[in-house]
Amino acid sequence: MYENPILQDNINKLMKFGYEFIKPASGRLACGDSGAGKLQDTNFITQVIESMLYDKKDLKGKKVLVTAGPTMEDIDPVRYITNRSSGKMGYSIAEEARDRGAEVTLVSGPTSLEMPFGVQFVGVRTNEEMLNAVLEKFDKQDIVIKAAAVSDYKPKAYSQKKIKKNEDELSLPMIKD
């Protein structure tokens, strides 16, 4: 239905008059087919509308890089050390910069947050991955905001195999990262 040429012509005509559209999501449709035509998530729709209604565009033309969330450092193939950072502050900063007209890149460690609309997202896991992602984009940015909760320490040695539970205690030497 969404791909129908008549519908697309009508959408294009309305866009020429200044109307804006939120493109549909893709997936399994009510008719049983798959493709574009599903209603977008309501949080996504809310973000798009808020961004359109935001009057203050003082960051228009600026490139902003924001880091967010925690990083994880592996101990063995099944365990890691991290912190409880939710990433909310970094994501909120990225959304605000986007709403104010900036071209935003969000470099984020693992979080349960939804990826913000209209933001270039780079997902990372470790300190090293975050550093490399930031350095790759750094020179092209006007503003860099470091809101991530990067791990301060990492295990001195990574165990290639899962550490067995043979002992009552485990000593885990750490080094500054």
How should these model regions be labeled?
Residues 1-2, 29-33, 75-76, 115:
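A short acidic, helix-capping loop that chelates divalent metal ions and anchors anionic groups
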Residues 25-30, 70-76, 161-166:
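Gly-rich Lys/Arg/Thr-decorated short loops/hinges at beta-loop-alpha junctions or inter-strand turns
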Residues 7-8, 12-16, 58-126, 172:
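Glycine-rich phosphate/diphosphate-binding loop of Rossmann-like nucleotide-binding domains
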Residues 21-24, 106-107, 146-147:
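General beta-strand structural signal in soluble alpha/beta enzymes
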Residues 27, 69-73, 148-156:
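Short glycine-rich anion-binding loops that position phosphate/pyrophosphate groups of nucleotides
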Residues 110, 118-177:
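A glycine- and small/hydrophobic-rich beta-loop-beta segment
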Residues 46-63:
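Flexible nucleotide-interacting loop at or near the entrance of a catalytic core
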Residues 1-26, 36-49:
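Short, glycine-/small-residue-rich phosphate/pyrophosphate-handling segment
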